[in-house]
Amino acid sequence: MNKLELDRLDAILNELSEFNEDVRSFYMCNDSLNMHNTICDMRTELISALEIVNDAENRMGH
């Protein structure tokens, strides 16, 4: 793996780590507004991770 691939992998892992924290927060939520905000955060982090994966696949010609 080259430096760029490692950086992308690190970015994906960071997004998934934040997603995991949001999942934990989601189960601790006690009102619907917090639940909604947490779900929005989870969605944003997954989309970011998927965009990084998609970009990497496009660069590799897949």
How would you label these PLM feature ranges?
Residues 11, 15-62:
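Short, charge-rich amphipathic interface segments used for partner binding and complex assembly
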Residues 1-13:
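Short, charge/polar-rich alpha-helical segments
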